[in-house]
Amino acid sequence: MLLRLLLEGLGLGALLVLICALGIRKGAVGRVHLYHEDVQSRAIAQGLITKEQIRKNSLRFKRLCIPGYLAYVLVCVYALNGARGFLPGFWQLLVILSIMNVIDRLLIDDYWVGHTDAWIIPGTEDLRPYITAQDKRKKWCFGTLGMAVISAVLAGIMALILH
């Protein structure tokens, strides 16, 4: 079961990487909504994107990704793995989401954004690092606690539905 959960977590992480790659395929400005306000303002001032485009990209990202991630983990845990009850669902959800969180923090934030040129928006290089040490601490804390809360809420809802 643990190997299965590891693979499902890696699958969710791969989905996140794919979504990021698609978002920056025409340049990192496509995901500027993930950057700090100063980077967004600079991109707008340079005519690379408008405030409205940033808003639309952010909404599209949230509308597609969040339901997609939730559907993925629910299908894995309840349809494929057959979890029933709160505790079996909770720990499986937590493992899968935690693996994705580690991939997001280490592979995407630390390596891809922090050490490659793929996420550089022209004219904003002086605003690097795009993800500061303080951001990283917040993301680790929120990611760790957030995944536990999300897992608990989803497991609770599914325990009620499947009861």
Located regions from the model:
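Juxtamembrane non-transmembrane "cap" segments at the membrane-aqueous interface
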Residues: R105-E125
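Interfacial segments of alpha-helical transmembrane regions
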Residues: E8, G82-I99
